[in-house]
């Protein structure tokens, strides 16, 4: 079974039109730029007639040189990283050790005779691609759709957008690479079904489960490893060559390993001088890495509810290795789809989406998902989840919150990310305060809170209080992002601690209910003691003391029983007078509504 039947265009006449938008695949190892017109895609070649440009940046003779396989490489791995993260991650530190300014308080590299940010260096790649496109198409280009790994955090996405902006691009949309690949396949026919996109690039691995129904592409689950790719396979082969043939661990040996990998993709053996390696050895060397990626894919499928998949879509040049196709078939027993050149599938999708955004001619819709739940901290440290994990984006959710104490003139908002039940166990994203609220009884102030995630995965939170007409909006800053490794750890911790978290939340909710009840009743009694007899006051105080003792003991069953006893005895012995108190203080609420 095939998703599409498609041929790569050889010579395509692209009509000149008023608006032009390109698709860009800014890859860890290689980058591509393409344009689409009427669903026909053309990958734009460089001056040396190559469609694929190595993502390397060199600086010589006061000029930047892109794509000569010298200088700084794999810069994509650095997007969204802090100086501390790079210093503490050997794989990242090795990329920039010759350029890193370790005495700086921020991440800057000593590059091009100055201290320069990562986004400024990456912008040179975008400038190069932009110049190539303008030269080939003989027109000015400013609009682009750019692809990013599915697990790029806000920090990384922000740096991609900034780099593109520095290069002179207006970014129409950031789309996940697996989503772009599915777009490239799906738009060419009206296929329905569920597909696993297996994207193994030079430096990142992404897997997505996509539901394709009548032009709608919905990512229902994502996973991956943003520190794994074809580069790691090159390292494994390099280590083998060094050990087996006593070669130095050098750039030349690494290049030899790359050549061996590429040759063994379509041949059974590779020979170079006195060095020989066959496909069987290659497969033995890389099998653990391949199995690791398949385990991630299977876990992603489980997250999506284990739907029946109709095929696996291959993305990334590394997927040409026969072992990968064989192992994927063994694992999933479905067709392995690779009709489009796996190096170009992502940029095809980006170009098609760019064309659609400037001249919509299709009903197709791309939907990515939220990788971790987003919510707010409530009184007592409880997390109220507002946007759940794997919710399709863009999305906006509105909820109403109220004050906990009397005469509050401000509400503090703590935005959280994670699957745990208590704020202390989740990741803090941002804090802000809604100030200038009128002093009123607890529960009378209502704040309308909106969580919104745009198509680029950027979160903004706004709060609005109607009585005072007070509002506040915050966009989560990029340095609050989270990478794929942290996502996996957080999900694992949430799973392991699910029962404990649930019990802790129930206890905290019981304590909060007890405190609210005590505060409300004591406040009412202080204002309206003349309505109650001494014996009634004594009974109420005794019952409240029981609730206080249970809350202090942090015994949920005891708390619930003491509250139940309070309600039962109060309703039986002093229903009329207590109702007067409650109606006067809580304005229409009965005791069961006190929160």
Curated annotation (Swiss-Prot):
> Entry's InterPro entries?
ATPase_NBD, Heat_shock_70_CS, HSP70_C_sf, HSP70_peptide-bd_sf, Hsp_70_fam, ISC_FeS_clus_asmbl_HscA
Per the record, the domain of life is: Bacteria
Query: Which Gene3D superfamilies would you find in this protein's record?
Result: 1.20.1270.10, 3.30.420.40, Actin, Chain A, domain 4, Substrate Binding Domain Of DNAk, Chain A, domain 1
GO molecular function: any one?
ATP binding
- Entry's Gene Ontology BP terms: iron-sulfur cluster assembly
- The entry's keywords: ATP-binding, Chaperone, Nucleotide-binding
Query: What is the similarity comment for this entry?
Result: Belongs to the heat shock protein 70 family.
Q: Which PANTHER family match?
A: HEAT SHOCK PROTEIN 70KDA (PTHR19375)
- In Swiss-Prot or TrEMBL terms, this protein is called Chaperone protein HscA homolog
Q: Which organism encodes this protein?
A: Rickettsia akari (strain Hartford)
